[in-house]
């Protein structure tokens, strides 16, 4: 049996989330679906529109088998910390596949971006330089990616 992992905020839960769950249930009929979900606060410390209990009920009602709350200390951080700790939780729970949705449906572009972020020393050096320009991680992250890719 496959144990499928999903990482989400469900803020709010929408048709794309429902489609995601339905597609997983159709493709992996005998699977168990584990969701790592933010609680009252979201990535970068924003307050969730829906409280964690209601988000959990919605997830369970639409076919998620197990919901695990991502602790605030990780869930309110930048995307890399959010993702790293979410995946760590899923790994500790024995998840065999992690499935995510995508607006672009372009896995090659995602792979290219990940390789740049992980392996390109010039990119890493530019990130360090831009830390001093912007106060918010998300702002300098976008700035450096723009300058790196387009200039």
PLM feature spans:
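Generic structural signal for well-ordered alpha-helices
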Residues: 21-22, 56, 87
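Charged helix-capping and loop-helix junction motifs
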Residues: 50-54, 82-85
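Active-site cores that bind ATP or allylic diphosphates and position pyrophosphate for catalysis
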Residues: 64, 69-151
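N-terminal catalytic cores of NTP/NDP-binding nucleotidyl/phosphoryl-transfer enzymes
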Residues: 1-52
């Amino acid at each position: 049996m496959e144990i499928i992992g999903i990482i989400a905020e469900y803020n709010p839960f929408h048709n794309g989330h429902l489609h995601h769950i339905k597609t997983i249930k159709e493709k992996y009929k005998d699977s168990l679906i584990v969701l790592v979900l933010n609680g009252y606060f979201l990535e970068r410390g924003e307050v969730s529109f829906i409280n964690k209990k209601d988000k959990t009920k919605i997830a369970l009602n639409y076919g998620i088998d197990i919901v695990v709350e991502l602790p605030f200390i990780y869930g309110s951080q930048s995307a890399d910390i959010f993702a790293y700790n979410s995946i760590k939780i899923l790994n500790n729970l024995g998840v065999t596949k992690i499935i995510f949705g995508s607006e672009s449906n372009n896995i090659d572009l995602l792979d290219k971006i990940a390789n740049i972020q992980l392996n390109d020393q010039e990119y890493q050096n530019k990130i360090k330089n831009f830390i001093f320009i912007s106060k918010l991680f998300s702002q300098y992250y976008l700035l450096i990616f723009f300058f790196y890719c387009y200039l």
